[in-house]
């Protein structure tokens, strides 16, 4: 089994940090649903401002709030205004990677979705893997795909 990216929220702005909480990250259910992130699912969080990398679980906040709140010990790693990348994963047999279509949402500073992307892995007749990033229309994007400044 291989650990593979299942979905990603790229460039969310942290809206809060609550040290006096049991733990987790609070996210807008609309963002989670669109990226395929479940409540109580463990996610990796990468802070683009500090470089901190942590793992915690998701709890759902208020629908439509565009919230991104680090709770408990995680609040020490991310502060309001920091930009983060949140990624969930799935374990699959290597051959099944071609069936996955991870959703990637990118955001502006107000946590509004600015783009919806899909990752795609294919395999050619010689068995070599190929990777593509596609936009909402299915058009292939250049790799590496540069993140637009928000």
From Swiss-Prot:
Please state which protein family the record places this protein in: Belongs to the PanD family.
Q: What does this protein do?
A: Catalyzes the pyruvoyl-dependent decarboxylation of aspartate to produce beta-alanine.
Protein name, entry field: Aspartate 1-decarboxylase
Residues annotated as catalytic = 24 (schiff-base intermediate with substrate), 57 (proton donor)
Which species does this protein come from?
Xanthobacter autotrophicus (strain ATCC BAA-1158 / Py2)
Q: Which UniProt keywords apply?
A: Autocatalytic cleavage, Cytoplasm, Decarboxylase, Lyase, Pantothenate biosynthesis, Pyruvate, Schiff base, Zymogen
Q: Where in the cell is it found?
A: Cytoplasm
Please classify the protein's predominant subcellular localization into one broad category: cytoplasm
InterPro entries, from UniProt?
Answer: Asp_de-COase-like_dom_sf (IPR009010), Asp_decarbox (IPR003190)
